[in-house]
Structures are given as structure tokens and as C-alpha cells.
């Protein structure tokens, strides 16, 4: 399964989270299957988003789209996000 890992700083987490939640239907329509949010323990404005996609090509296209960039800007994303595309390799136990 393809994943997209996004890491960025935000001005205010609550503002960013509201914008992220409001964009859920756009993500779903683009092929996103859901995911998980993470915050840095030492810096709660450092946010990581791991999203599963039905195709890597759709994830890449979504990440490059103007509407996504506009949402990020309005949500208070600081600077250029780090975006990495991942493939599911192996699940490991303790």
C-alpha cells in the first residue's frame, strides 16, 4: 500500500487541525484511505501526517495540487513541508 508522509511546522495546531479536518472530503475524493496524525513531544507545532492512498500516483498528484497548497497556506503551515512517498514493506512485532 502506498503512503505519503508529510512533516511541517504550523503556526497554531488548533487552526491547522480545523483546516485539515475540513479538507477530508477532498482527500477522500483524491484517493486517500485515511491515516494518522503525529505531533513532536518537544515541539507540538511540528506535525507529521501519515496517509494511506489507493495509488502512489494519486498521492503525488494530490500533494502537488494548487488547492492543497492553498489549504496549507490558510492553515498556517510554515515553510515548505517535507513530503516522502513510502511503500508498505513489512510489519514487525516487538
Regions from the language model: what does each represent?
Residues 2-9, 36-65:
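Short, well-ordered beta-strand segments in beta-rich or mixed alpha/beta enzyme
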Residues 12-34, 67-71:
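Short amphipathic alpha-helical segments
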Residues 16, 24-25, 49-51, 85:
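Residue-level detection of beta-strand scaffold positions
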Residues 12-14, 55-57, 89:
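Residues that cap or initiate secondary-structure elements
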Residues 30-46, 70-94:
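Glycine-rich beta-strand-turn "strand-cap" elements at beta-sheet edges
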Amino acid at each position: 500500500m502506498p503512503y505519503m508522509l508529510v512533516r511541517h511546522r504550523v503556526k497554531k495546531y488548533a487552526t491547522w487541525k480545523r483546516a485539515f479536518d475540513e479538507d477530508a472530503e477532498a482527500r477522500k475524493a483524491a484517493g486517500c484511505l485515511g491515516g494518522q496524525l503525529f505531533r513532536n513531544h518537544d515541539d507540538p507545532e511540528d506535525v507529521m501526517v501519515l496517509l494511506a492512498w489507493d495509488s502512489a500516483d494519486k498521492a503525488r498528484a494530490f500533494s502537488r495540487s494548487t488547492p492543497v497548497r492553498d489549504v496549507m497556506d490558510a492553515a498556517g503551515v510554515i515553510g515548505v513541508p517535507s513530503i516522502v512517498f513510502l511503500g508498505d514493506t513489512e510489519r514487525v512485532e516487538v
